[in-house]
Design a protein with these regions (language model features):
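Charge-rich, well-structured scaffold segments of protease-associated domains
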Residues: 1-102, 109, 119-120, 137-138, ...
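His/Glu-based metal-binding/catalytic segments typifying zinc-dependent metallopeptidases
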Residues: 102-161
Length: 310
């Protein structure tokens, strides 16, 4: 009974996602990047499969993936002299869990030889939502340090290139931002914008234009200095919160990466140079790696695909 009750709740949640184009455009972008893989599937699932899932399937899934050897328990904050008691308590709660053999994760091997475009037509969409991106680095790549700074330069703040060009200069949108998604063996760097339906072509040209400018001219020493200072400031503020540390060390341990202190991370950031970032731009900015997803009220427009060129 509880499975059916929760199923109805999730079906309503699924409808909410369908009504939010900003979420939908991310879904179709990932399916475009990673077709025919679990990474490219919707996290919430599909209605048909959700209606078929029963208690036995859920139990089997839990058995396959939830095991002590996959578990990381991270504590941070004012623990002090209580650490021994906490360790004992955690052992009491979780130490007796039976060990079991779990499945290995699937390896994703991307294959793309030309730009791709995915479009969903939503007749009642008041705005067009688009993502333009490129394939990039996996989660543990050393490229992540330099690229994090480049991302700040391109699309994270009011002083970023994309904000100044797309919003301030051209007035094409209220919100534009860039960001990375890095997984075990694949990753991407993406730009999102919400624009008027009749401005999609202009916005696409403007975004591609900024990518072309970055590829041709790279970044400047001044931009790197500002980005580095901004990143350090962000880390200083965030590190005051114990939740930051639970995520910092917890995710690192969970993903099997070498533990890195904040001081170690800052050393990596300080070591990033303009030539290093420009080399990564050359490495990742390739026409055949471009992908675009779009949710708007119109049918698919093939002209947009022709604009995807670096």
């Amino acid at each position: 009974a509880w499975v059916n009750k929760e199923r109805d709740v999730i079906l309503e949640e699924m409808k909410r996602y369908e009504d939010e184009p900003a979420n939908k455009v991310e879904e179709i972008y990932h399916s475009l990047l990673y077709p025919h893989t679990k990474l490219g599937m919707r996290i919430i699932g599909e209605e048909a499969s959700l209606r078929c899932v029963g208690a036995n399937e859920l139990r089997n899934y839990h058995t396959q993936w939830y095991a002590p050897e996959r578990m990381v328990i991270m504590l941070a904050g004012a623990i002090g002299s209580q650490s021994n008691n906490i360790t004992e308590q955690v052992t009491e709660w979780f130490g007796a869990l039976p060990k079991k053999k779990t499945r290995n994760i699937d390896v994703v091997t991307p294959s793309q030889t030309k730009p791709q475009l995915a479009v969903v037509t939503k007749r009642d969409a008041a705005q067009a939502h688009l993502i333009i991106g490129l394939r990039a680095y996996q989660r543990d790549s050393e490229d992540r340090f330099a690229w994090g700074l480049f991302n700040l330069i391109m699309g994270v703040s009011f002083t970023s290139r994309l904000f100044k060009e797309i919003r301030e200069k051209r007035g094409l949108c209220y919100h534009v931002r860039s960001g990375s998604s890095a997984y075990h063996d694949v990753g991407s760097w993406d730009i999102y914008a919400g624009v008027a339906t009749d401005k999609v072509e202009e916005a696409t040209k403007a975004i591609i234009g900024e990518l072309v400018r970055a590829k041709a001219g790279g970044i400047t020493e001044d931009e790197l200095t500002v980005a580095r200072k901004r990143l350090k400031t962000m880390l200083a503020f965030r590190s005051e919160d114990p939740e930051f540390w639970t995520e910092w060390y917890g995710r690192t341990e969970l993903f099997g990466m070498p533990l890195m202190t904040l001081a170690d991370y800052i050393k990596k950031i300080d070591a990033v140079s303009v030539p290093a970032i420009n080399a990564l731009i050359t490495k990742y900015f390739k026409t055949e790696s471009l992908n675009m997803s779009l949710v708007w009220s119109k049918p698919r427009d093939e002209k947009l695909l022709t604009l995807l060129s670096l």
